[in-house]
Amino acid sequence: ALWKTMLKKLGTVALHAGKAALGAAADTISQGA
């Protein structure tokens, strides 16, 4: 189904965005900001 494909794409995008956000947060914390 088309909605399943869209959902999978959204999930992938959300996952990458989450990883990027976590990475940025970790960098900020490690710098003591």
From Swiss-Prot:
User: Which residues are annotated as modified residue Alanine amide in the UniProt record?
Assistant: 33
* One Gene Ontology CC term in the entry: extracellular region
Which InterPro entries does this UniProt record tie to the protein?
Dermaseptin_dom
Say which domain of life the source belongs to. Answer: Eukaryota
Its GO biological process terms?
defense response to bacterium
Q: Which UniProt keywords apply?
A: Amidation, Amphibian defense peptide, Antibiotic, Antimicrobial, Secreted
Tissue specificity statement from the Swiss-Prot or TrEMBL entry: Expressed by the parotoid glands.
Q: Does the keyword Secreted apply?
A: yes
Question: Where does it reside?
Answer: Secreted
What family is this? Answer: Belongs to the frog skin active peptide (FSAP) family. Dermaseptin subfamily.
Q: What function is annotated for this protein?
A: Possesses a potent antimicrobial activity against bacteria, fungi and protozoa. Probably acts by disturbing membrane functions with its amphipathic structure.
Q: What is this protein called?
A: Dermaseptin DS VIII-like peptide
The protein's organism comes out as Phyllomedusa burmeisteri
